[in-house]
Structure formats: C-alpha cells, structure tokens
From Swiss-Prot:
Residues 1-51 are annotated as: Disordered. It comes from Homo sapiens. The chain crosses the membrane at residues 514-533. PANTHER family: EPM2A-INTERACTING PROTEIN 1, LOW QUALITY PROTEIN: ZINC FINGER BED DOMAIN-CONTAINING PROTEIN 5-LIKE. The keyword Transmembrane applies. InterPro entries: RNaseH-like_sf. Residues 1-513 are extracellular. This is Protein FAM200A. Belongs to the FAM200 family.
C-alpha cells in the first residue's frame, strides 16, 4: 500500500481502517458504553463478588453485636458506641494501617438505636438460653430483693442458682419493674406471673429461697416468703440473708456509745456539708502534712461504713479540733473529752472488725459451711474478748487503735475502768444479739451433715455410725472415704463441683449434699445487681428500660453469635 492510499483511508463512523495488515473496526460510542456496562454487570454478578459483599455485611453485623455486648457489659451509655468507640477505632486503624482500612469501619451500624436493639436481642437470647436450662427439670434456688432506682421506680431482682454440667451456676433470673405502691402480695403475683406464666417453670424444682428480713418480705401482713414456700409445697428452705442479719447485730449499741457515734457524724456533716469548710480543712491538713486530708461521708443504708468514717475522724482528731476552735463550733468541746475520744477509738476498731466479717460473707459461690465457720468463729472470739477484759490484767490487743491511744495518752484509772465496763457491756450485748439472729439450733442440721464438708475425715466405721445416716448412705460414705482418686478431686474442686462430679457413683450422698448446698445464704448478688442498676440508670438516663442492659451485664451465659447472626438483622416495619 502506497503512502497516498494510506492518506485516503476511510475514517467515517462504522468504517474500517487498515494499517499494515491490521484491520481496526470503529465502534460507535453508544455500542462502546453498552459493551463496558455488560462487562461490569458480569463482574458484579459473579459469585466471588457476591460472596465477598455478603461476608463484609455479616462481619459488620457481627461487629455491631460484639460492640453492643461490650457496651452492656461495661454499663456504658448506648451513644458511646457511635461517639467514642467508633472514632477511637478509626483513629487507631488509620494510624496503624491506612485511611481505606479505617473507612471500612463506617459500614458497622453503631447508632444508639441500633445498639439498643442489639442489646435487647442479646438479652432475649440469653434469657431463652437460661429458661431452656431451667425448663429441663433441674433443681434451682432463688434469692430476691427489692429496691428503687433513680426514678423512684421499685425494682425486683431475682437471681437463680442451678446445677449445670459440672458445677453450680448463678445467673440473673429476672429484673421486674414494679408499680409505685406495691405490697408483698403484689410482689408474689408479679413473681408468679413471670416464673410460671412467662417462663413456664415449676415451683416443685425450687429448693431454696433467700431474702432479707424486711417487712415487705417477711412482714405479718405481706409474708412474701411464706407464700413462696407454700407455692413450693414446703419443699424449699428459706434463709434470712446472713449479711443482713450481721448488719442488724452491729446496730445493737448502748446509748453512751451511740452518743459518741452521733457526735462524730455531726462533726463530719458540719465540715463536709459546707464546701468552704471542707476546702479549708483540706488546706489546713495539707499544710500540716498529714496522710489524709478529707473526711468520709456516712450513709445509713451502709451502716458498717461507719468504721471507716470513725477511723478517719479519729486519725484527724487533732486537726479537726483546731479547725472547730477556729470556727467557734461547740463540737470542739467533745474533742477535749478524753473519755469521748477513747470511746471513739474503740468504735472505729469494733466497726472495722464487723465490717471485715461482713466482707467475708460477701462474694459468689460461697457455701453455707463457710458462713457457718465465720459466724461461729466470731461468736467464740467475742467470748474470748469478754474473758480478756474480765481478767485481773485486762488486755486490749484486739483493738489496735484503742490500745495505741491508751499507750500514748495518760488516761485516768477511773476513766479507764468506766471505758472497760462500757466495752464489756457492748461485747456482751453483741454476743447476745448474735445468738438471737444466729441461733445454735438453726445450725444443728449443718453440724449433723458436717461429713459433706470433708467426707474423707470419716475413715473409720465407728465415726460413720455416729452420723445418723441411712444404711445405704453409710455404705456410700465408707466407699467414698476410701477412694484416693476421689480425694485428689476433692482437693482441687469446689465443694459443690465435687459432689456433682460423683453423682453417678454415689447418688444418695451426692443428692443430699447438693440439696443442702444449693440454696443461697445471702442476697449479695441482688445487692451487687442494684449497684449495677445505679450505674446504668442515672439522672441523664432515668427513662431507660434497664432490664435488657441488666440481663446482658450480669448474665453468666455466653451468647451464641451464630444463632444471633441467623436472625433478622433489621427490625420489621
């Protein structure tokens, strides 16, 4: 082809161009767009792309559930996911990786309404898991307590303990929002509607009920616990909360010591009740260089907190006295009274000791034998202290603050005798009150079943005969106490887990032990739940329906994320 022929090549639309043996076909502009659009549709509709897109959506949905789960577990506001968690995650991913990776996090639905729905879904899922377990016919025990939230709405918390797999499991059974004016009968009706009506549980499987001794629970007009026991056909046992009983014991105090307590509280209120006084005392204590510069408030509902309050008042007694003199307060006069200050030292010690006893009875998965040991041990300790004070050479070693005060100050002998008599009367009163709230006859059944605490302590047939067991039970205990393998399990397992583990080999002893260990002995979990409620339902969130958040925050069950993912991601419209 000559150059001239190349110059005259047809370049019209739809024509062809021939260049050195290559034929180029000109495609119209409209056809070209259709061609690429078809190719694009093929790519987008390919299984690989669809799978990738579906996977990303599933990951975003799962991430949304996981974030909502953490928000509820940490008792955070629902807006925290979108306002705090997401921006923080994007900052971290952008810093460590790149902007493109960070932008992918925006596909995760984290609005406050979405988080709220996710928490409700998780709560219903956890509730269904728990109820399915309880509906299988296993034995369970409950503890219940009532309180009011920040919006003055009564709330009833019910916890359950049941046998699952290889140990006891404790979980929140229900959180019921009640009407403003409610009686014990109303509480029973609400509880029965929930457990029997909604959950379809059977009262015959309830083996224990624990509550405090308030009028709404045990009063002669309401008698909630009595109605619950009737519903179980008296197959369950009722335990008055050990912690509540110990708090009632600690309130037994003579008028003289009560005056010391009231004046100490008045002093704290005078200083802490005024922001100016509180700041001035803080500045004064800082200038002197003392260890603490603040006083502590006391609340009546936390009666035993007075131990820390009194200890702080005693520690800062000299600084408080100087401050009160400068303020020309009449309360300064009480700090000039040696007897008053000495009694203050004693009260700070005894309330601290009672507080330690209360802490020993708090916690999860404690068995009744541990509580029995703490109570009986403290009762004997009180008797020992009384004997020490009655001796010719009285000793105050058990009250370190009081002992240090006596050693560092010159106290009149007559004053010291008066104080010793006051302390002795208080310890005697404590012993009597302990015997009233923890009567020895109530513990007789526990003492008869002490073999449950350590079955390997009964190696001899003679010791087993004294336990008043049935012949079949005696034979099981003899075989059990002779097993070296099971003794090793006993050392490493909890008491409840041990008896559950051997339920097939020793059914009689195991069943008897489980029924005794299963009931709660305190309402500690309810008190813990109400503390969580105060964190969830604040003044800014006083309209929150706290039940779903409480369920997720306190549940012992672990969500099945695959099952949740199979549910509808968006609510029906």
């Amino acid at each position: 082809m000559t150059p001239e022929s190349r110059d005259t090549t047809d370049l019209s639309p739809g024509g062809t161009q021939e260049m050195e043996g290559i034929v180029i076909v000109k495609v119209e502009e409209e056809d070209e767009e259709d061609h690429f659009q078809k190719e694009r549709n093929k790519v987008e509709s390919s299984p690989q792309v669809l799978s990738r897109s579906t996977t990303m959506n599933e990951r975003a949905l799962l991430s949304s559930y996981l974030v909502a789960y953490r928000v509820a577990k940490e008792k955070m506001a629902h807006t925290a996911a979108e306002k705090i968690i997401l921006p923080a995650c994007m900052d971290m991913v952008r810093t460590i990786f790149d902007d493109k990776s960070a932008d992918k996090l925006r596909t995760i639905p984290l609005s406050d309404n979405t988080i709220s729905r996710r928490i409700c879904t998780i709560a219903k899922h956890l509730e269904a898991m728990l109820i399915t377990r309880l509906q299988s016919g296993i034995d369970f025990a409950i503890q219940l307590d009532e309180s009011t939230d920040i919006a003055s709405c009564p709330t009833l918390l019910v916890y359950v303990r049941y046998v699952w797999q290889d140990d006891f499991v404790e979980d929140l059974l229900c959180c019921l929002n009640l009407n403003s004016h409610i009686t014990g009968l109303d509480l029973f009706t609400e509880l029965e509607n929930c457990l029997l009506g909604q959950y379809k549980l059977n009262w015959k499987h309830c083996k224990g009920i624990s509550s405090d001794g308030t009028a709404n629970m045990t009063g002669k007009h309401s008698r909630l616990t009595e109605k619950l026991l009737e519903a179980t056909h008296n197959n369950a046992v009722w335990n008055h909360c050990f912690i509540h009983r110990e708090a009632l014991v600690s309130k037994e105090i003579s008028p003289s010591l009560m005056d010391v307590l009231k004046n100490a509280v008045k002093t704290v209120n005078f200083i802490k009740g005024s922001s100016l006084n509180s700041r001035l005392l803080e500045i004064f204590c800082s200038e002197i260089g003392v260890n603490h510069t603040h006083l502590l408030f006391h609340t009546e509902v936390r009666w035993l907190s007075q131990g820390k309050v009194l200890s702080r008042v005693y520690e800062l007694r000299n600084e408080i006295y100087i401050f009160l003199v400068e303020k020309q307060s009449h309360l300064a006069n009480i700090f000039e009274d040696d007897i008053w200050v000495t009694k203050l030292a004693y009260l700070s010690d005894i309330f601290g000791i009672l507080n330690e006893l209360s802490l020993k009875m708090q916690g999860k998965n404690n068995d009744i034998f541990q509580y029995l040991e703490h109570i009986l041990g403290f009762q004997k300790t009180l008797l020992l202290w009384q004997a020490r004070l009655k001796s010719n050479r009285p000793s105050y070693y058990m009250f370190p603050t009081l002992l240090q005060h006596i050693e560092e100050n010159i106290i009149n002998e007559d004053c010291l005798k008066e104080i010793k008599l006051e302390i002795l009367l208080h310890l005697t009163s404590l012993s009597q009150t302990f015997n009233y709230y923890f009567p020895e006859e109530k513990f007789e059944s526990l003492k008869e079943n002490i073999w449950m605490k350590d079955p390997f302590a009964f190696q001899n047939p003679e010791s087993i005969i004294e336990l008043n067991l049935e012949p079949e039970e005696e034979n099981e205990l003899l075989q059990l106490s002779s097993s070296f393998t099971l003794k090793n399990y006993y050392k490493i397992l909890s008491l409840s887990a041990f008896w559950i583990k051997i339920k097939d080999d020793f059914p009689l002893l195991s069943r008897k032990s489980i029924l005794l260990l299963l009931p709660f002995t305190t309402t500690y979990l309810c008190e813990l739940g109400f503390s969580i409620l105060t964190r969830l339902k604040t003044k800014k969130r006083n309209r929150l329906n706290s039940a779903p958040d409480m369920r997720v925050a306190l549940s012992s069950c672990v969500p099945d994320w695959k099952e949740l993912m199979n549910r509808q991601a968006h609510p029906s419209h």
